[in-house]
Amino acid sequence: MRKIINEDIAKCVGCNRCIRVCPVEGANHVYKDNDVIKVSIEPERCIACGFCIDTCRHKVRFYEDDTEQFLSDLRRGEPISLFVAPAIQVIEGGMQMLMWLRKQGVKKIIDASIGADICTWAHIRYIEKNNPHAVITQPCPAIVNYILKYKHSLIRYLSPVHSPMLCTAIWMKRYDRNTDAIAAISPCVAKAHEFEQTGYVKYNVTIKNLMHYIRDNDIELPEQASGFDNREAAFGRLYSMPGGLKENLEFYFGKNLRIDQAEGQGVVYESIDAYAEENPAMLPTVFDVLNCGEGCNLGTAVEHNISRFATHSMMDDSRKQILKTFDRDYYNRMLAHFDQRLNMNDFIRKYLPMATKSMAVTEDLIEEGYQRLHKSTEIQKTFDCAACGCDTCYEMAKAVMLGDNIPENCIQMLHDEITDVLNIAVSNISTATLLENDISEIQEQSGTISEFIITLTEGITKFETISKSILSIATHTNLVALNASIEAARAGIHGKAFAVVAEEVQSLAAKSKEVVSESEEISKKSQKAITAVNDLLTNISGSYEKANISISVLNQSLSKIVDSIDIDLDAKKKIADTTVSQAQLPESVTLASDDSDDYDKVPEYTH
């Protein structure tokens, strides 16, 4: 199937808004590119609802249609006729744009409201003939895609009647005998899929891209508005508003037929999911569903340059005009005309389910997903902030295991990891403070040792002085002993005892010299050792001083990190809270307006 939604992935910042609004699990794939989280489209799973285009603030997502090819073929002279969706009536300059297309060579311009009238007729006759238990309407191809891909059990409930736009194309080809290539001026991105699957329409020319082309090329539209090349439609003009088909059916059946409706992001696909699980006895006869909250008037391929209130006002004026112009008698004549001219089978569609890749999900698989997300407690598993794009942590665990998302996209896991870093940083601050205190204490002790060394150095200096005195005394004693020996020798036998004493004194003086000499050597070595120790202590003190400064700087840095982490955690919590709040906001407000009961005389029904 054709890829309609595309992307400029370089612009993606991984904000996850596209995942959050997407009704399909796995239609978006999260991955990392150079440490930047990116989200790409999985074309096989995409249903072309267009929600991601509207929600993307970075202009990553965009759609592709056939506007350029249509205009190129028109310039080459290829015969092309077109039909126009009823949404054109709320587009400023829309009818002048159609006149410009006529001047470019378009052969015929048909109001698709005729197809809407045919669609209503076909539904009425189908319901009357078959009395179906339940019918899901199918004007929106995105919803048809969703059911054909993901809700096969609901295919049997899909209305067999073609959409109003396809009914128009079939009428043009089979009943108006138009052999031209058919283009659709469309408010819908996903119509390209419907046209591809059915083969009647060659070009999906979206209103938005056609208007962009006219504006970008400075084309001045003619003042004259274009009309249509077919009869005026009746209630089919209301199809582009929410509940348009419902209003058409109720004009015929009244309130005897239960018709429920659902439209818009956050409502319609959840309702379809619930429909699939509902007790069949609780289902309405007709379930009128639209992809867009404001219907086709503000569809996925329409510039939203007009408010919903202005749109409702225009549609209310259109309804009042219709009620003044057409009454039940006219309506019955129109249905009778279709009975005579149209073959019901021409407007019936058959559906085939589409296969998509799927993987069985078990509780063990989910548990492994929780482990990858570091979720072990019940609180962690039910945090459900939706910041990752998934509504619940369960869905995120599932997406991680299916390869659709990555753990790094979990804000709670990042929060926990940052908290761990914070705790480590706080612990490091405590350790650094203790180390700083220890170093200060060592510095104090080093200072005390330095003082001891100074005292010791002074003592050694005094010891050297004393040693020198002893050496001097020993030298002098030695001289005295020598003189005494000489005098004892002169005295002969009488000086013999004195000679012995002199000899002992001389020996003692010699030993004193030796001791002093050894002491001087030890003193020199001690002095060198003390000097070396003193130098070492000086170096150590300097190193400790530098370490102390570094630790102080580290402490300050860690404190700043802790403060910034606290701020970051607060910010992330606010983001998560905001995300949850946004996820709980209603998608849109449904407004209702009263129908007018004024009827004028109706014109004769003619084709």
Residue ranges and their predicted role:
Residues Y63-H374, E378-F383, D391-L402:
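Iron-sulfur-associated redox domains of electron-transfer enzymes in respiratory
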Residues E458-H476, E487-G542, I549:
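Parallel, heptad-repeat alpha-helical coiled-coil signal-transduction segments
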Residues S430, N437-S446, S526, I530-D600:
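Alpha-helical coiled-coil heptad-repeat segments
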Residues T377-F383, G403-I406, Q412-F452, L456, ...:
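HAMP domain helices
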